[in-house]
Amino acid sequence: MLYRKAQVSDRWLRAPLQAPTALHQPLSYISRSHIADVFASQENGRKDISVCFTGHRAIPPQELPALTERRDRVLEALYQHGFRDFICGGALGFDTLAAQRILLMRTHHADVRLRLAIPCSTQSARWKASDCLIYEQLLYAADETVVLSSHYYEGCMYMRNRYMVDNSAFCVCYLNRQKGGTMYTALYAMQEGLPLLNLAIASDCERLIQGTKV
């Protein structure tokens, strides 16, 4: 498992409950001021085979069965199109749903890689214990984890979203509300020229699965 290493303060180390245990083994903090320099040369080589995911935290129960089926079929189609790296933000809801399926894909496609882009090490500080447990499991299982800040600050989620888009060649979203972080990320992806597939639109998913452009 690859982690990005840097030093953090003793104060942060003395507060293990503020960040998941996985982020302390080893430390995986990098300041946002160094993101471009550190990652440009290392990630560009895989950008062409990378897909990022963005979606709402709250998923209506009645939409979950159809969304799950589309997720599974779209991920397999993306693999057949040559994509191998899948970048998720590690948040609740759609992010977790995507990451869990990617890990399952890895059991029968050995070259699949799950890359987590975490906005801050304290992302899960106020989550329920059950959600934190799932988050820890994802952190340990991921092939690569990038933590963009040691602490929360206003705008860190948007920084994470831009990082994912900047290191991808395709964006998959679950978007049914015209506001919030998912909408921002989808607009940014389109601005940067990435193909965008919305899992909330069944016809677009079917076109990709059938091998035609979205």
Residue ranges and their predicted role:
Residues 9, 13-24:
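N-terminal polybasic/positive-inside topogenic patches
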Residues 3-6:
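Extreme N-terminal basic, low-complexity initiation segments
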Residues 1, 211-214:
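Short intrinsically disordered terminal tails
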Residues 29-211:
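Acidic/glycine-enriched connector segments
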